[in-house]
Amino acid sequence: MEEYLNPINIFSEIGRLKKVLLHRPGEELENLTPFIMKNFLFDDIPYLEVARQEHEVFASILKNNLVEIEYIEDLISEVLVSSVALENKFISQFILEAEIKTDFTINLLKDYFSSLTIDNMISKMISGVVTEELKNYTSSLDDLVNGANLFIIDPMPNVLFTRDPFASIGNGVTINKMFTKVRQRETIFAEYIFKYHPVYKENVPIWLNRWEEASLEGGDELVLNKGLLVIGISERTEAKSVEKLAISLFKNKTSFDTILAFQIPKNRSYMHLDTVFTQIDYSVFTSFTSDDMYFSIYVLTYNPSSSKIHIKKEKARIKDVLSFYLGRKIDIIKCAGGDLIHGAREQWNDGANVLAIAPGEIIAYSRNHVTNKLFEENGIKVHRIPSSELSRGRGGPRCMSMPLIREDI
């Protein structure tokens, strides 16, 4: 891959993808049960063997298109292998944020994690630790009173969706405060990568950090060009965080001077903006519409002389707003063409959650055949991946990837 001056270079949603972050599906998916899957934000239980096969097709398409793949488990391993002290610090922080309360169990877990190779330790942290894996473990009174479950350390099945814990914006990142407690531990990995990894530790500004007051998730962060962002206000991202991100970007004198905040309904089906709205070509977007799906649009700009943010509500349609701020006419391809039945079905299975690997070239789930056909009829090249198992987590190709470097357009 050609060299870039910065390890993060994201100034669009569609520039040719050069480097991306993924996670290989692991044993964490095997630790989901019907009794706990809702708590972990899954609507069904994926079959790991097939999920891995589907994910490998995804990775193969990326590689065949000359995209360099980093895996988050490999990056954190490269961080921890450099220092025993750092490994011990990471173990202690991970256990603390897993809310282990008794000194006895904390010490058992420290000994257990330290006994593993770093790669196996990271895999086990993601997949979860059950009581039988800790020798000499006994339930405390607190465990018995509060009904401790099978897991001492809960699994993290949503690590599959690398889009959300941090997001690349320009040459920096937001390390996100996740909306649900069950996902907050995922951001420890990003914290250590951007603080300690030799490639990233001194070269990547942090626009927002993981302990902010309000939640922000990467599925709501879209970079349209060097001056324009679209941020969703959704089930998972709060308005406060959008304003705080705007302040950070403006005061750090980045190239971004306008943020469009798209408010969407707080609904499980539309958990992030990118489940209903993504860019796929210079002037082409895909979106889902229904009776209960609407966009309220707010514009945030900065006045350097007064150091204040100006916020106004747009009254125009989304298409007209985007055309104005992009300076060109845009088209929107509706999920399944707006069909009431196919549109709802395909949006539920991430028909709008596609990953652009170049202008007018995307990766999409094969199951969304109506929407995919519409894309092709409108000149979009579609790489299809199987998704009978991956789709059970309610995330598509965009959700499963975090671009690190795109070519500028």
Swiss-Prot record:
It catalyses: L-arginine + H2O = L-citrulline + NH4(+). The keyword Hydrolase applies. The active site is at C399. It is an enzyme of class 3 (hydrolase). Coiled coil: none annotated. GO terms for cellular component: cytoplasm. It is found in: Cytoplasm. Its EC number is 3.5.3.6. GO terms for molecular function: arginine deiminase activity. Its main location: cytoplasm. Pfam families: ADI. Pathway: Amino-acid degradation; L-arginine degradation via ADI pathway; carbamoyl phosphate from L-arginine: step 1/2. GO terms for biological process: arginine catabolic process to ornithine; arginine deiminase pathway. Belongs to the arginine deiminase family. HAMAP family: Arg_deiminase (MF_00242). This is Arginine deiminase. It comes from Borreliella afzelii.
